Curated annotation (Swiss-Prot):
Gene name linked to the record: cca
PROSITE patterns for this protein: HD (PS51831)
Disulfide pairings: none
Protein's organism: Neisseria meningitidis serogroup C (strain 053442)
Protein name: Multifunctional CCA protein
Cofactor notes: Magnesium is required for nucleotidyltransferase activity. Nickel for phosphatase activity.
Domain comment quoted from the record: Comprises two domains: an N-terminal domain containing the nucleotidyltransferase activity and a C-terminal HD domain associated with both phosphodiesterase and phosphatase activities.
PANTHER family: MULTIFUNCTIONAL CCA PROTEIN
Amino acid sequence: MQTYLVGGAVRDYLLGLPVKDRDWVVVGADAQTMLAQGFQPVGKDFPVFLHPETHEEYALARTERKTAKGYAGFSFHADKDVTLEQDLMRRDLTINAMAQDAGGKIIDPFGGQRDLAAGILRHVSPAFAEDPVRILRTARFAARYRFEIAEETIKLMRQMVENGEADALVAERVWQELAKGLMEKNPRKMIEVLRECGALKVLLPEVNALFGVPQRADYHPEIDSGIHTLMTLQRAADMGLSLPERYAALLHDLGKAKTPPDILPRHHGHDLAGVEPVREVNQRLRAPKHCAELAELVCRWHIIFHQVGQLKSQTILNVLKKTDAFRRPERFQTALNVCIADTQGRLNREHTPYPQRAHWLALLEAANQADSGKIAAECRAQGKAHLIAEQIDRMRLAQIAPLQKAFQAAQDKTEKH
């Protein structure tokens, strides 16, 4: 019985990165051997055991065989006769198909070290095509390391999409990989890879439809709506924004794909037009509620947020109420963060100031100065409970109006200069 450190731990060690999780493979053993040594079985689908002391995962070396379409359609064979190389051969990419023995020696039968040095993602064997999740994983690794994908691998990924393998992916796995990819340093790269292999059209057709849709060059020097979406997503990542914020950045402009051709490159009403496509994506991916809600909120209101300097005080109050800013100020703030990414996610506009965020937050704080509890008590004491909401709005408007007037005056002064 021999044990080897495998997969991501070896890859990250060779890259000089912190090793977070260690996975081990055991050669020359079976389940009875592991149980006799105190290991605890945990794998439902595969022979995986927890070490009695470290609680790290140890898997028996195994081979796999495709039995049906989709990521779950596999049978496996785990026995004492399965070699380390056979186990490594079933893995997705060469950079993940390396092992390290107890003495520190690297076992690399498929050229993983060479590909690491060259910054290449390359599949180990044709068996890569048997698991459609590998399309998403490869795109995610590209986003993490900014590696290029080997020509033969991207070709194989295209064939998988054409053969309908991507259609077999279940929502939970798509969301799981998409969420991980969005949180990588370069999420733009993930979307680019998915588009290059054709998977974006299958998994996120609403995002794919943005590419080739023109925008006004004076607002968007990058012209293409899809490119702007990628730039907004990447800006959100560079800002260190959360998963819900990055997801909202990805979907914020879906309405531009719905713009009638005769009014292009203008996109009047794309904020409203995008709401239904955002809902469709949320439902299809089964996105978590906090992600889904923020994506819809940003899509619906980002243009209004941008144009705060043009709004009347009553409109501002209506927006604060409709976006639930009084009850959920943290979510309101995250929506404004995405608006910064939207503004700066344009060609040569990466450092454009966004005073609207601070102003919206100041408006919300000012409106909150109206003591709703006191107003309600006074109305009830006067027998005018039916006027509570109206009186609260009146007090909030009194707080908002001077702040908005000052902001507009400062804006006018800046424009004149």
